[in-house]
Amino acid sequence: LRPEQLGGAAALASRHPDTAIVLCHLGLGHGEPDAEWLGGLTAFAERPNAHAKFSGLLSPTRTDAGLADLADTALRLFRADRLMFGSDWPMSARTHSYADVVAATRRALPHPDTTDFWAGTVTRLYG
């Protein structure tokens, strides 16, 4: 999804409260975060059945600081128990190796309590 579609994702999550809905790429991907994106992501995250993948966010122009800002926003809105790692492989391989994606994500999420982010959330949702 793109930022302008996040309101629709929030509405979908509201209409189907018993269904876990997972948003890829924080609804942003390689785009730049702005007020429209943050408002839509916030509205989506307010639904208890809303989850997000921290994936597809690396680009040749996104800095470690920019990725860390996205991680802080995602953790604030979803907490680690509704947020999960995603490599975006094989698409990410066009610009970054898998090891680079993991390393950049670890730098962006240095928080000690990220077990849910790396494994718990995906295990709960997908078994």
Label for each model-derived stretch:
Residues H25, A52, D88, T114, ...:
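Divalent metal-coordination and catalytic microenvironments
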Residues D72-T73, L77-M84, A93-G127:
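Mid-to-C-terminal alpha-helical segments outside catalytic/metal-binding sites
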Residues L1-M84:
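Catalytic pocket-lining loop regions of alpha/beta-barrel enzymes
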